[in-house]
Amino acid sequence: MIVHLLRHAKTEVFSNTGKDFDRKLAPKGHQQCLELKVLLSKVMGEETNIFSSSARRTRETAQFIFDEQKEILFFDELYLSGKNDLMTFISNREEAKEILMIGHNFGISELASYYAGKQILLKTGGFVSIDFPDFSVNELSASIGIIKANHRCTIDY
């Protein structure tokens, strides 16, 4: 089992509606997506299941990276989810062998830290790939993951 975790790209500070859920990507976020597109094309398998929060910033991150080349499933419950909710979501994907989850801090970083057994702080556009050789989606637990890739966008702020 491989779990890829991606924090959404850089966003504008405020949305036109005043709602956090509606914040869109900033120009630097678009540049980060171009960088991530190259990286993810190299580290993700063809059959990767892609799940994303339905917030505007995660939706835009996913769509900029994958265009319409991959199926992306969006879920309201992934918006600002904590580690435990993310773990439950992943464990319910019994058929998956490889997952990419696009989400938010602090939950996405907490999940990465839990699986890898060390502190991982994903900045905007941050990505980590964690491998669980010989483990199924229902067997994932603390500190058993092996970090295969850890990327921080060169366009950070």
Task: List each model region and its residues.
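Active-site-proximal alpha-helix that buttresses catalytic centers in soluble enzyme cores
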Residues: 2-77, 81, 108, 119-125
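Active-site donor-binding loop signature of nucleotide-sugar glycosyltransferases
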Residues: 8, 77, 132, 152-153
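Short aromatic-enriched loop/helix-cap "lid" or pocket-rim segments at secondary-structure transitions
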Residues: 16-18, 86, 140-142
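Active-site catalytic microenvironments for nucleophilic, acid-base chemistry
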Residues: 39, 64, 68, 92, ...
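Short alpha-helix plus adjacent loop in nuclease-associated cores
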Residues: 80-90
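A polyampholytic, Gly/Pro-enriched intrinsically disordered region
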Residues: 92-105, 143-153
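Non-DNA-binding regulatory cores of transcription-related proteins
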Residues: 93-100, 106-125
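Domain-level recognition of soluble alpha/beta enzyme cores
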Residues: 118-148
